[in-house]
């Protein structure tokens, strides 16, 4: 996102599928795009909201200002409806948290190492990754003759996102399992799914937590806690308890 340029690059999953470049797409073009199952990288915290803003009619300048607010962690710059534009977020479901650029370097190095263990399809995809810097100031308008250069830079990020997704399919399978157990979606965050799995639909589970005064000795246990401990730790609970002296 630049003051005068808004690019959306994407591709259909699979070998040989070309990257589609959308230069300053209209709201109707974005509306058509979000009908697809979109997989992005950190899209829940950035891309989804930029695309949703365009869908709502934001101009390029307004998109740029929104982008700066998101990057600078400004409050009240996210759209609640935008989070679920994507099918899933690669950054969030990956157990290893690092930037896309670091994934580009790591996967490219691994793909070019003949002794590394990697699926042939993933290796071929990773070898296409070209890590380079754009070399243009992000806060300045881009001359129209350089728009293709910027689009090519975005192509690399699309390929890197697909490669990162396929190189971490094990993590995605784990996300699918967690989503099923929690009755959620693969686009929900790991944190929200874990919370939902443990506490269900209770949004204020703290009210059910068991608190006690740690400065006071334990003289007795509630029946449910006692039953749980006897089942979970029978050997420990078989020991005689004489209480505090």
Per-region residue spans from a language model:
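Short coil/turn segments at beta-strand junctions that form active-site/ligand-binding loops
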Residues: 34-36
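N-terminal, helix-rich and Lys/Arg-enriched segments in bacterial and organellar proteins
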Residues: 8, 41, 46, 234, ...
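Conserved "right-hand" nucleotidyltransferase catalytic core of DNA-directed polymerases
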Residues: 106-114, 121-245
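Gly/Thr-rich phosphate-binding beta-strand-loop-beta motif of the actin/hexokinase/Hsp70
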Residues: 1-11
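A short, structural micro-pattern
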Residues: 2, 32, 79-84, 191
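Active-site-proximal helix-loop-helix substrate-binding element of RNase H-like nuclease domains
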Residues: 18-20, 38-53, 57-159
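Nucleic-acid-processing active sites and adjacent nucleic-acid-binding tracks
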Residues: 15-32
């Amino acid at each position: 996102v630049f003051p005068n340029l808004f690019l959306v690059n994407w591709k259909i999953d699979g070998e040989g599928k070309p990257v589609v470049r959308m230069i300053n797409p209209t709201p109707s073009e974005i509306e058509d795009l979000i009908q697809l199952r979109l997989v992005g990288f950190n899209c829940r915290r950035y891309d989804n909201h930029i695309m949703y803003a365009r869908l709502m009619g934001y101009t390029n300048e307004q998109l740029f200002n929104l982008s700066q607010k998101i990057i600078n962690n400004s409050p009240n710059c996210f759209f609640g409806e935008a989070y679920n534009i994507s099918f899933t977020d690669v950054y969030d479901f990956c157990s290893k948290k690092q930037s896309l650029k670091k994934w580009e370097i790591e996967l490219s190095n691994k793909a070019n190492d003949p002794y590394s263990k990697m699926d042939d399809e993933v290796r071929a995809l990773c070898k296409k990754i070209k890590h380079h810097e754009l070399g243009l100031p992000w806060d300045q308008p881009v001359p129209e003759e350089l728009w293709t250069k910027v689009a090519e830079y975005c192509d690399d990020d699309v390929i890197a996102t697909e490669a990162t997704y396929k190189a971490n399919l094990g993590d995605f399978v784990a996300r699918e399992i967690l989503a099923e157990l929690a009755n959620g979606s693969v686009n929900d965050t790991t944190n929200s799914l874990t919370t939902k799995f443990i506490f269900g639909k209770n949004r204020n589970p703290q009210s059910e937590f068991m608190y006690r005064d740690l400065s006071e000795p334990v003289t007795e246990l509630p029946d449910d806690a006692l039953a749980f401990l006897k089942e979970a730790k029978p050997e420990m609970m078989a020991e005689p308890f004489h209480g505090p002296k």
